[in-house]
Amino acid sequence: MSAVKHVISLMAIVLSALSLSHPTLSAEDVSERFAPMADLHSSEGSGSAVDLRQCIRDINTSHPTLSAQDGTVRFALMADLHYSEGSRSAVDLRRCIRDINTRENLDFVMVAGDLTDFGTDEEISAVKNMLDSLDRPYYVVPGNHDAKWSESGCNTFRKVFGYETFEFLCKGWRFVGCSCGPDMRMAPALVPQESMEWLRNLEPGEKTIFMNHYPQDTSVLNYFDVTRELKRIGAVLAIGGHWHSNTLLDYSGLPGILGRSTLSAGGNPGYNIIEIEDDRLSVSECKVVGSTGVVYEPWCRLTLRPVEDRVEYDSHGLPTDYPWMKYDVNETGDVREIWKFRDKSNIVAGFARKGDRAWYTTASGQVRCISLRDGSVLWSASFPGKIFSTPALSGKYLVFGCTDGNVYAINARNGSQIWKSAAGKSVLGSPVIRGRKVYVGASDGCFRALDLASGKPVWEYDGVEGFIECRALVDDTQVVFGTWAGRLYSLNPDDGSLQWVWKCSRPSRMYSPAAVWPVKSDGKIFIAVPDRCLYALDARTGDELKVWNSVARESVGMAPDGSAVYCKSMWHTISAFDPYSLETLWKSETGTGYDISPTSIAAVGDEVIMPTDKGNLAGFRASDGKPLWAFKVADALVNPMEVWEIPGGYRMLVSTMDGAVALLERKCTR
């Protein structure tokens, strides 16, 4: 037999024998699981083919049900575990796992996101240890609670579980899954660009089942792109969680199933058992009562059939029933697009800009330098972690934080590294350069001032509770920043000594002044908090001076001369306040609908620019709040912008979470 034929023969053995193809594995996993196969020195007539079959048999029989030959696929679906140390969630999960392990006819377990409550490193490691007590394979996808409040910038989930996407086969069925976002910023879900690229590279086939934490409807900003790809690859069902209840949905012809949470929530913990026989699917809830799992009659029965994409799309790729602002708003000509391109990665931070160049970071660990003349990429540098930090620029130094646990300074001209300074955990905060110091916060309970030239610490304040994701307010008298422990800190910029701490009165850490970029005017600090309030604090003492209810969430801004402070509510209003008298100057309807974006409001000349979580911008007259224009850049959250005046108007350098980068121009009539 020729060498080629022999290799083909061995491949045939592997493909025919393996009932399961594993998701992406780390190098350590590959070495551990497949070490016996690494030393196969096959030759015709040797016993190596028999040895290979034995290795495969050992893999497939790590749990006996994987090699069951009845043709029926049976698996457990758990969702919304919300593991939190010391809470009832751990007890509920343990009871569900114990019950699953008693059911010998289950092939595997699917876990549909929100494994943790707050995405901390400790929560992720602890829930992984609990899931490892399952006595059969399990597959997970992260949910919004694992991604939005992740102190590691979504790195720990990938590191601990070994993957963010998966694809495997079981008894003729293909199962695929990916993350849902939103990565670090409050916004509707968005399947990341990296996951979308992975979906686009999947081969078309039949009998595919997709898992994602979210329902694939308008809960996900790019739902139409996801469902279009799912139909292309032959998906016949999408399963998920998020709603904490058993629900049957229809995604333009593609059936969707959402499973209950494992949480008892005043009742019993539980999960679902899904069975597929031929093309017939049934879903039954299992409630764990005491030590007994009670399986109920199926709450869903379906016949799974191929699905054609019958959705009608407009020229921009949006479905005709797209419920939000569409691109036709751009036809008014109030704002002109000079150039625009799409990065292959998510972008979750703003820009640094100087002259005809700008720099931005990506969630795939890239730093790119672009020309403002035409948007061309002048250079790109890669780093070993996701980047959620807006870079700061001073002279040749471009400085940013990375989820690999370092602050980097690179040469702005060519991307070469000048220095890096290690933190104890991921650095999600955006640096501020003032004088010869770099001010930046991390996830290790420490805020630092670093020497710009060397990266060596000038001072460190290690009394921070919660992790830092914002850009601090820095001036000659103080450094002000919030954390995900409900606290706002003010430090001395010279030595890092604590000046004061303000704490939100709401006990939940969800109500933290952590995403807002604070502003300061007339000796007052202004912040917006997810309790929907705008706070004015005495900059010297941290005492509350005034609280405005139901006008804000996490986004604020300030007039260039400090004469007005701006904030926006979740429900289509934007307001302006006088920082001197603390009176309301105006309040306007935005026309943009429900919006939870934390991105700061920008102001230039006599106009105020409000970014949204759906790729839109809206402009208002600064003097009275009159709506002036609207523009759609892309379909996802707008990141911090660069805005500058030009003769007769201004320009806006804009990026969005789904990877769009654009230069816009507005001509103003005085």
Predicted regions and their residues:
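His/acidic metal-ligating clusters that form di-metal
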Residues: 99-108, 169, 176, 185-255
